[in-house]
Amino acid sequence: MKGNETVIKHLNQVLKNELTAINQYFLHSKMFKDWGYAKLGDYEYKESIDEMKHADQIIARILFLEGLPNVQDMHKVMIGEEPVECLKCDLALEEKALVDLKKAIVDADKLNDFVSRELFRAILDSEEEHVDVIETHLNLVDKVGKENWLQSQI
């Protein structure tokens, strides 16, 4: 089924965000575990896998719409040097993804591509949950202090 070029461009933009997130979260998960923060590492690993599932769905949709998934295009991976900085890097990536997803939802709706719109909406829901978790962690750092928060991540 031939898809609309605007929707396919949005799908590739969202794919770019997801591919970047897979790599960033995977590396952060390994860093967290290496630093001894197993809980944080486990969570970050699960997020990386979640992003991979999103990428899988996006690639399938692009192919269904007779487009070409651009799996070579990624943003610069932002890697923190300590746990709080890692979370701030993840938050910046998620905030960019939210903007792109909201634009994609609006355009898919205008172009009557309701399946792509629903895919974007489902991914948006997942990314908003991740933002909430990151913001909760950062708020805890402010409330209980970095050292106490880190101790809770062992």
Please report, for each region that a protein language model flagged, where it lies by residue.
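Iron-associated oxidoreductase/ferritin-like identity signal
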Residues: M1-I154
